[in-house]
Amino acid sequence: MLTKFLSLLLLLLLLGCAFCNSDGSQSLHMLQISYFPDPYHGRHQGNASLGKLLTHTLEGPSNNVTILQLQDWQDPDSWARTESGLKIYLSQFNSLVQLIYRERKNDVVFPLTVSCSVGCELPPEEGSEPHVFFDVAVNGSAFVSFQPKTAIWVTGSQEPSEAINFTLKQLNTYNRTRYELQEFLQDTCVQYLENHITTQNTKGSQTGRSYTSLVLGILMGCFIIAGVAVGIFLCTGGRRC
């Protein structure tokens, strides 16, 4: 079940997260939120920015999401494919919630809100280590978080539950959710930021293309983990599977 579940979420995505600057450093900070008042209705919200430049927005119910590209970094045909792929993903995401509800109706708790925060930051001074992070929250409470130095997922709650322990066991089993994520955050994301500082004023079009690739890669992992949190929480009702 989990293998099929993860495979379903390995779709090419572009939106759903927020990138922003922190004081004194160059950073990428991403946030994606999905809200389900009941099994049959979902609403998604997200945006993407590079530095202080807002590049994409996403908002709306699962069956009528509005997705906008604010910067012309993808040609119309390419953007149409990206937009279509994301809408298909969101539709399948909503269908997955309904499926789990049908299977475990007595254990599902609504409303349900899942948020996924992931990013990397360059320090204001040379010689300091970059800061990278990946945190998942369910219904406003810390659920799990990623420790990049050890490539281990840990509980984000003061009181670990069987649901959280089960989730951690699954996340710490797969190379994709451990070492591939570690490499992407510590290497790919950080290197992109370093290169962006150098090239942002001289190679605008190239920056746009590399930024698109970066977002695609990060968000694949972003939605995988957010999806795992949704699936486990719905399956357990916050208690046990």
UniProtKB/Swiss-Prot annotation:
Q: Which UniProt keywords apply?
A: Blood coagulation, Glycoprotein, Hemostasis, Membrane, Receptor, Signal, Transmembrane, Transmembrane helix
Q: What parts of the sequence cross the membrane?
A: 214-234
Q: Which Pfam families match?
A: MHC_I_3 (PF16497)
Glycan-linked positions? 47, 64, 139, 165, 175
Q: Name one GO molecular function term.
A: signaling receptor activity
Tell me which InterPro entries the record gives: Endothetial_C_recpt, MHC_I-like_Ag-recog, MHC_I-like_Ag-recog_sf, MHC_I/II-like_Ag-recog
Q: Which parts of the sequence lie on the Extracellular side of the lipid bilayer?
A: 21-213
Q: Where in or outside the cell?
A: Membrane
Q: Does the keyword Glycoprotein apply?
A: yes
- Look up and give the membrane topology term: Single-pass type I membrane protein
UniProt name for this protein: Endothelial protein C receptor
Gene name?
A: Procr
